[in-house]
């Protein structure tokens, strides 16, 4: 496989172009790695590919009409390929790998969220805030963020919210059980903890977006970060709150935890709560965001609202905002 800048790398017929490029240390652009965002869109100048998800929304109708646009995360090679893409010089994150994993824990946290713990049987490497892709038989590939830190024991903790009508979450909620084997691929993700930054940390999570924010704050604490850390966690109702013991532990370790309950219901004792949208809570609680690093994860409407309020309206530098839009 050859890029327009002359670099080349190997890609198996069962491997996506994105996975192969990253595994080869090539910094190919991407965001969701699951076909929805379009960030890994590139032009196929020679060769042919097979598509894992032919209807992936990351390609627009105009892209499809052109006939030579592909999503690197959804394309496996059927021949030698030449691809036109603007790739960076060197990959800064751990390269993705495929792992055989086994479910060790499945725990219901609230009516719509489960905790799933997988184990790959050996050391697992990822940066705080990254995610893995799960191959789900009959449901395709789904991306889920990790809540814990890399470790020698091979454990991966996922917080998964049921998506109404979603085949992936249906498989995990209704069919998955301890002892079940799964194939996972990763790590992926660019919204990881910038460990070399001395700026304060503001983490914003909507729903299961709490998983990567837990990982980021745990990672900062593990590195001895002594600056200010604030976590804003938004849900619709008090019944949708989860991981309250983990939130309390973060607060005890020095982070400030802010809960935003859209319906204004009561919150758990010991944690600051306010009614309304998480974006309102963020703007009210952070008058000096320009001096901090902002991490955001959650549903696309929430993420887009936060970006509009911060990058566009408040002119916060884009290179200090790291987001994972769940689509």
Curated annotation (Swiss-Prot):
Domain FAD-binding FR-type as annotated: residue spans: 96-194
InterPro entries tied to this protein: 2Fe-2S_ferredoxin-like_sf, 2Fe-2S_ferredoxin-type, 2Fe2S_fd_BS, Beta-grasp_dom_sf, Cbr1-like_FAD-bd_dom, FAD-bd_FR_type, FNR_nucleotide-bd, MRET
Inducing or repressing factors: Induced during growth on aliphatic alkenes (such as propylene, ethylene and 1-butylene), epoxides (such as propylene oxide and 1,2-epoxybutane) and chlorinated alkenes and epoxides (such as vinyl chloride, cis- and trans-1,2-dichloroethylene, 1-chloropropylene, 1,3-dichloropropylene, epichlorohydrin, and epifluorohydrin). Repressed during growth on other carbon sources.
Cellular component GO terms, alphabetical: cytoplasm
Catalysed conversion reaction: 2 reduced [2Fe-2S]-[ferredoxin] + NAD(+) + H(+) = 2 oxidized [2Fe-2S]-[ferredoxin] + NADH
Main EC class the enzyme belongs to: oxidoreductase
Family: Belongs to the bacterial ring-hydroxylating dioxygenase ferredoxin reductase family.
Protein name, UniProt field: Alkene monooxygenase system, ferredoxin--NAD(+) reductase component
Organism of origin: Xanthobacter autotrophicus (strain ATCC BAA-1158 / Py2)
């Amino acid at each position: 496989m050859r890029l327009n800048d002359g670099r080349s790398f190997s890609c198996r017929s069962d491997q996506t172009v994105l996975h192969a490029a990253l595994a080869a240390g090539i910094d190919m652009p991407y965001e969701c790695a699951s076909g929805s965002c379009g960030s890994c869109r590139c032009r196929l100048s020679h060769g042919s590919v097979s598509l894992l998800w032919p209807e992936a929304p990351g390609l627009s109708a105009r892209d499809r009409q052109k006939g030579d646009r592909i999503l690197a995360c959804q394309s496996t090679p059927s021949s030698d390929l030449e691809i036109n893409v603007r790739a960076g010089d060197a990959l800064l994150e751990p390269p993705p790998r495929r792992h055989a994993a086994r479910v060790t824990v499945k725990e219901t946290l609230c009516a719509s969220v489960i905790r799933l713990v997988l184990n790959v049987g050996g050391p697992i490497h990822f940066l705080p805030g990254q995610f893995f892709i799960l191959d789900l038989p009959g449901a395709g590939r789904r991306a889920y963020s990790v809540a814990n830190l890399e470790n020698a024991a091979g454990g991966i903790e996922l917080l998964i919210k049921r998506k109404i009508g979603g085949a992936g979450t249906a498989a995990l909620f209704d069919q998955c059980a301890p002892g079940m084997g799964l194939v996972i691929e990763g790590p992926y993700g660019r919204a990881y903890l910038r460990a070399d930054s001395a700026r304060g940390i503001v983490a914003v999570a909507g729903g299961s977006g709490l998983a990567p924010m837990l990982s980021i704050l745990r990672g900062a604490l593990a590195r001895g970060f002594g600056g200010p850390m604030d976590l804003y966690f938004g849900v619709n109702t008090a019944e949708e709150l989860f991981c309250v013991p983990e939130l309390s532990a973060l607060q005890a370790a020095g982070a400030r935890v802010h809960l935003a309950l859209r319906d204004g219901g009561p919150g758990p004792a010991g944690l600051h709560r306010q009614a309304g949208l998480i974006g309102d809570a963020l703007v009210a609680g952070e008058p000096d965001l320009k001096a901090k690093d902002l991490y955001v994860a959650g549903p696309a409407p929430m993420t887009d609202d936060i970006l509009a309020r911060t990058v566009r309206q408040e002119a916060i530098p884009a290179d200090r905002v790291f987001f994972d839009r769940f689509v």
